[in-house]
Amino acid sequence: MAGHYGGNLRQSTRLTIVKEKAKHPILRGVEDMWVQCGGYFANPLQPSEVLVMAQPLVSMKKDAKPDPKRKPVPGAWTRSYESESGDKGRVFTSTYGASNDIEDDGYRRLLINGCFWAVGLEDAIKADADVSFVGPYNATWRRNRGRRQNGLRPQDLAGWETPIVPLQKK
C-alpha cells in the first residue's frame, strides 16, 4: 500500500538511514538526503528490509523542521524473493524519484547504489564513486523551468553534452 503523505508542492522530505542498516551496501557513501516531491506513505510487503525512513518537512526548504503531524515512514527498501519456478531475485524500491529529487547528491547515490545491488554488483559499490550527471540535467518538476521537448528520439540524446532531457524552446 502506498499513497501521498503530506502537502504536495508545499512539503519536502528528509530521508534518513535506518541506523541498524547503515552497513548495507546500498548505503555506502550515502548521506544527507533531501527530496522535493512531497511525502509518500508506504507499507512495504514482508519480508522487506527498510533502509531509509522518510520524514515530511513543514516546507520546501532543505533545512525545514519535521512536520509534527507526520511520523517517519519507509522511504526506501529492498526485498528478496523466489519465484514459483525457483528463480531468485531481489529488488530495491524508493517512493521518491521526481526529476528534482535526483538533483540531491545523496539521494542520487542511493538510487545508483540500489541499481548496482539489485543486479548483484554490490562489490562494485564504492562510497566515493562519482555520481555526477554526465551532461547538463534539466529537472522540471515544480520549478517552472519549462516543459520537456516532445517527440524526442534516442538519437537526439546521443552526445555526452546533450541535456538530460532538453527543454522546449520558448
Model-derived features: positions:
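Extracellular ligand-binding/catalytic regions of CAZymes and related secreted enzymes
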Residues: 59-60, 64-170
